[in-house]
Amino acid sequence: MKAFKYIVPAFAVVSLMSCKKFLEVQPVDSVSDGQTIVDKTSAETATRGLYRALSADGYYGLSFQSIGYLSGDNVQWTGSQSIVQQFISHNVRADNATIASVWSSIYATINRANHIIAKVPAVTDPLLTETLKNQLTGEAYFVRALAYFDLARTWGGVQLALTPTNSATDKNGIERSSLAETYAQVLNDLIAAEPLLPETTNRYRATKKTVWALRARYHLYQGEWALAETYASKLIGDATAFQLVKPYSAFFANNAVATAESIFELSYSSTYTNGHRNQWQPPANNGTRQWAPNDVFVGLVNDATIGGNRSTLVAKTTQGLWYGNLYYRSPATDPAYVLRIAEQYLIRAEARAQLTKLTDALTDLNAVRSRAGLTASTASTQGDILLAIENERRIEFAFEPHRWFDLVRTNRAAGVLGVTDKNKYVLPVPAGEVLIDRSLEQNFGY
């Protein structure tokens, strides 16, 4: 089997209750994959549908994000769905329903982007100006870049479907690309997106600034430290648009949306809700508490010298049960946080530490710590600073999709989580996908 080429690192769950089944019901404001984009109205509607796909339960609305935090070391399974434990114990099976949902949701998002990229430039409606054509096409390139980035860090090299299709099986027969080729496609799409997009601040839609933020993350994953520093600096230097809001909870508490903390977030409504709330909130708050912060994390985040004012990430019932409180609104209109300015500070801190710019690295790290109400880090050596950044990211992004991917990309999953089998650093390709497409190879070890 040639599967190793799909998973070599570049730098070296599904809700079974109250699931909206987004992919089975076409949103009223989206264009179906088979519908022609013929004018300004249908082009804009297709773009709204693209963001809906990105925010679906199977993607940023729940399941993809849950893989990132369940597979780390902050969360425990507390509910009725045993499928969750497969991620926590790092024994994910190929028939796991969550990975099937995530795989299909991400490819559905890619296909919506492909339709826009292929069709919008050819529309002749005079109401669809060249500027707007460029913007919509650039947004599609950005979303496709994000989607392939997420596929790459979850599964390794994947099938690169770059033209629109009318059914999920239309990509059958496309062989998997290598991890390097998959990441190259991410970069190609980001490069294509940037000149098409406006240099404005829009926290709900892609702009040049959104591209820069994802490029900073991309280059961090590639170990391209100077480029990671450069792109993160573009966002950090734009203080009129992006700031570390204080206190920490200001970006999510009191029904806050689109704060200066947010570079890119996804919105929800009373009729199109965020799936996270139901999984995190306890029955007393009309949730199911399928998972919860574990005892170690509760101790860390409530330690005034470690968590600082980030202790607002957790809360406790009158019965003494701890639960995550990042997603708390009723109805579940909480945003999904895709790119935050805090991440850019910690990306730049890590990149600078790797470049031995230790004083500058500490400045960025301490900016995040200061916002959390903490004193400056006492780390002084390169190794100590990198470890301090790793620990800061653990708390800062505890319930966002970072911890597992951070430990894998830095080769720390074995030392921190005890996951010594590197085959498990990527997930199995969903069994159903392999069964219907003989050209699709399973990841090694599954």
Language model segments and positions:
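Acidic, glycine-rich segments characteristic of secretory precursors and extracytoplasmic regions
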Residues: 3-4, 18-67, 437-446
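Aromatic-residue-lined binding/catalytic grooves and analogous aromatic/hydrophobic interfacial grooves
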Residues: 20, 157-158, 187-191, 197, ...
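Conserved, well-structured interaction surfaces
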Residues: 44, 82-155, 192-201, 331-339, ...
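Hydrophobic-face positions in mid-chain alpha helices that act as interaction patches
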Residues: 75, 82-84, 227-341, 382, ...
